[in-house]
Swiss-Prot record:
Swiss-Prot/TrEMBL catalytic activity: L-threonylcarbamoyladenylate + adenosine(37) in tRNA = N(6)-L-threonylcarbamoyladenosine(37) in tRNA + AMP + H(+)
Biological source species: Chlamydia felis (strain Fe/C-56)
CDD domains reported in the protein's UniProt record: ASKHA_NBD_TsaD_bac
Keywords: Acyltransferase, Cytoplasm, Iron, Metal-binding, Transferase, tRNA processing
MF term (GO), any: iron ion binding
Similarity annotation: Belongs to the KAE1 / TsaD family.
Keyword Chloroplast: no
Cofactors: Fe(2+)
Gene Ontology cellular component list: cytoplasm
Binding site for Fe cation: 110, 114, 303
Name the UniProt record assigns to this protein: tRNA N6-adenosine threonylcarbamoyltransferase
Pfam families, per the entry: TsaD (PF00814)
Annotated coiled-coil segments of the chain: none
Location in or out of the cell: Cytoplasm
Length: 344
């Protein structure tokens, strides 16, 4: 069975092929670089770029794998959550491929696919597992009874962790996206230089907006007027701010996990999303949690279509098909509270 996956939920246009053994045959990603000049993703520009790039990334994936569309058995496409225009372009393109080739099609949840990316490369994952997604748009924790079961435990109440990194990067004068650059600067700074901390939210939820504001005030000092320009800082000061911020942001997440693991009897942890590629965070969890940890490889942390094809294949084989595939910007997961699961 050969599955073709399509991903277009934000600013990456991607196509991948996964075979019957869930092995990646081809994985092509086209990133839209011009959003950097705007300091973030411009939805209309992203949609137009997907429309332009989808045919070429599909052709490239087919060429790399040495197959044609006739050899494809299933088409999987991201349909939620994400930028509605970008999702619509991907879903409609997938529908055209499915109709033209007379192949079955299945819709895939982008966030769930990030967790499946870790599962794809792991061996003998024990369930129930804690699923942690950390990206530019999401910071969510899930109870996973199996690879296809996702019940929401906790969520960010404001900014996502990746979004917070990008905004702090902007404060430090870094180009968009700023996450990887902050990690690099932090490795050269002192994480004890600034006593940053995020808001302590009751229960399992998270909050990063206060931490972001604290960093801004630390940079501006006494001149904290919102309209005042950001001062020039030495590279040493920037490195120290980056290190202190990074520690505070990740400790906020890490401190929530032991209670979740205990209350929901989690036997392993799956982590996904672009921020999961941060080596400081990986080391932090490895040093503080006594459970098997599974992170995707770097190529599967950021948005890609291999995770879409992999999860789509699994859903199809499990007969968990999507009826009436339509793009949807937001998605509401069943909560553990809905199932009367343990509360903090």
């Amino acid at each position: 069975m050969l599955t073709l996956g399509l991903e277009s939920s934000c600013d990456e246009t991607a196509c991948a092929l996964v075979d019957a053994d869930a092995q990646i045959v081809a994985n092509v990603v086209s990133s839209q670089q011009y959003h950097a000049s705007y300091g973030g993703v411009v939805p209309e520009l992203a949609s137009r770029a997907h429309l332009q790039m989808l045919p070429s990334v599909v052709n490239s994936a087919l060429e790399k794998s040495g197959v044609s569309l006739d050899d494809i058995d299933l088409i999987a496409v991201t349909h939620t959550p994400g930028l509605i225009g970008s999702l619509a372009v991907g879903v409609n393109f997938a529908k055209g491929l499915a109709i033209g080739s007379q192949k079955p099609m299945i819709g895939v949840n982008h966030v769930e696919a990030h967790l499946y990316a870790a599962y794809m490369e792991a061996k003998n994952v024990e369930f129930p597992a804690l699923g942690l997604v950390m990206s530019g748009a999401h910071t969510s924790m899930f109870l996973m009874e199996d690879p296809l079961s996702y019940k929401l435990i906790g969520n960010t109440r404001d900014d996502a962790i990746g979004e917070t990194f990008d905004k702090v990067g902007r404060f430090l004068g870094l180009p968009y996206p700023g996450g990887a650059l902050i990690e690099m600067m932090a490795s050269q700074g002192c994480e004890e230089s600034y006593p940053f901390s995020a808001a302590k939210v009751p229960g399992y939820d998270l909050s990063f907006s206060g931490l972001k504001t604290a960093v801004l005030y630390a940079i501006k000092g006494n001149n904290s007027n919102s309209r005042s320009p950001l001062p020039d800082l030495s590279q040493k000061e920037k490195n120290n701010i980056a290190a202190s911020f990074q520690k505070a942001a990740f400790m906020t997440i890490a401190q929530k996990l032991p209670k979740i693991i205990k209350n929901f009897s989690c036997r392993s942890i799956l982590v996904g999303g672009g921020v999961a590629n941060n080596k400081y965070f990986q080391t932090l969890l490895q040093n503080t949690l006594n459970l098997p940890l599974y992170f995707p490889s770097s190529k599967l942390c950021t948005d890609n279509a291999a995770m879409i094809a992999g999860l789509g294949r699994e859903l199809f084989l499990s007969r968990k098909t999507t009826q009436g595939i339509t793009p949807c910007a937001r998605y509401r997961w069943e909560s553990v509270a809905d199932s009367l699961s343990p509360h903090p």
